Amino acid sequence: MNRFIIADATKCIGCRTCEVACAVSHHENQDCAALSPDEFISRIRVIKDHCWTTAVACHQCEDAPCANVCPVDAISREHGHIFVEQTRCIGCKSCMLACPFGAMEVVSSRKKARAIKCDLCWHRETGPACVEACPTKALQCMDVEKVQRHRLRQQPV
């Protein structure tokens, strides 16, 4: 089942708590104080306009453009999400250019460039850290069935 994170711009206050939670959950010690600026890598991004703020994350597309353009097949669907195999990634940025949502990022380090994106915190039993940390509950982890149920509740009788 295709799961993804959806952001409600009417609830987002732009606090970036989701970014911190994401970076910490993907760091080996999971300790905010232990993160250096080079290690602070969030897979979700808060974007701001003069009238609104919202979070942007991978939409876990069924026919993912990022996976389709990867020249080394480093991007595939695993564990119910689009996954980047870091050992295969060559950091070419093709995936970043192909993503219609701007959810792919290529991060350079001293060793090599690598593509990163939301993996729905597959390593956490409780689900995505950003969803859990959001103080206004602007983020939700959804699947197609949840979206359909939500739409049915919103339709007038």
From Swiss-Prot:
Domain of life: Bacteria
Record flagged with keyword Transcription regulation: no
CDD domains, alphabetized: HycB_like
Binding residues for [4Fe-4S] cluster 2: C22, C118, C121, C130
Residues reported in the UniProt entry to bind [4Fe-4S] cluster 3: C58, C61, C66, C99
Residues that coordinate or bind [4Fe-4S] cluster 1: C12, C15, C18, C134
Binding site for [4Fe-4S] cluster 4: C70, C89, C92, C95
Domain 4Fe-4S ferredoxin-type: 2-32, 48-80, 80-109, 112-144
Molecular function as annotated in GO: 4 iron, 4 sulfur cluster binding; electron transfer activity; metal ion binding
Pfam family, one: Fer4_4
UniProtKB keywords: 4Fe-4S, Electron transport, Iron, Iron-sulfur, Metal-binding, Repeat, Transport
Entries under InterPro entries matching the protein: 4Fe4S_Fe-S-bd, 4Fe4S_Fe_S_CS, RnfB_subfamily
Protein name: Putative electron transport protein YsaA
Origin species: Escherichia coli (strain K12)
Upper taxonomic lineage: Bacteria, Pseudomonadati, Pseudomonadota, Gammaproteobacteria, Enterobacterales
Gene designation: ysaA
